[in-house]
């Protein structure tokens, strides 16, 4: 039914490379190249803005996709700022809801990606800009709802809660 998809959320943490015996033998540029080689295997690549800048010296998702041999779909998040994306040959910028009531951002990126994958699969892979925007907005609400309480696990949004929130934006 679906072809195999490899989704990578880089979650770069410099601290895991700074003190390993492996990293002491290679330069920072070599580390960047190793990571980029790994990212060549992705079908969908989710990056934070800082990761896009560090590994690709760019935040344009289309240009990042073109730098990788697999030409993945690319999503770039940046906290409360709009999400940049290149998906299924289309490129866009999607505003996602924000709140003044943020308690804890732990798990927001994971919730975003989980929501995106869920919507991606349930929609049969988006073919047009509206469907892609719907997936991104759904994912954004998943990330936001996770931030409204403490911890990543307790605040995991249920499908119904996300749809109710999205419905309140429309009415």
Model-derived features: positions:
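Conserved phosphate-binding/catalytic region of the ribokinase-like
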Residues: 59-171
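Conserved phosphate/ATP/ADP-binding segment of small-molecule kinases
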Residues: 14-93
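Conserved small/polar residues in nucleotide/adenosyl-binding loops
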Residues: 1-5
């Amino acid at each position: 039914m679906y072809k195999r998809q490899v989704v990578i959320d880089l979650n770069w943490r410099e601290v895991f490379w700074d003190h390993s015996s492996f990293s002491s033998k290679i330069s920072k540029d070599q580390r960047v190249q190793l990571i980029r080689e790994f990212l060549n295997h992705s079908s969908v690549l989710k990056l934070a803005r800082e990761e896009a800048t560090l590994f690709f010296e760019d935040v344009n998702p289309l240009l990042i996709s073109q730098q990788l041999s697999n030409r993945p779909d690319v999503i770039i998040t940046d906290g409360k700022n709009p999400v940049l994306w290149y998906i299924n040959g289309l490129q866009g910028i999607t505003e996602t809801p924000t709140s003044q009531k943020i308690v804890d951002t732990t798990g927001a990126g994971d919730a975003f990606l989980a929501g995106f994958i869920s919507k991606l699969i349930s929609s049969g892979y988006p073919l047009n800009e509206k469907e892609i925007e719907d997936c991104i907005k759904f994912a954004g609400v998943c990330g936001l709802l996770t931030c409204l309480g403490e911890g990543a696990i307790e605040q995991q949004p249920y499908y119904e809660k996300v749809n109710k929130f999205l419905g309140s934006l429309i009415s």
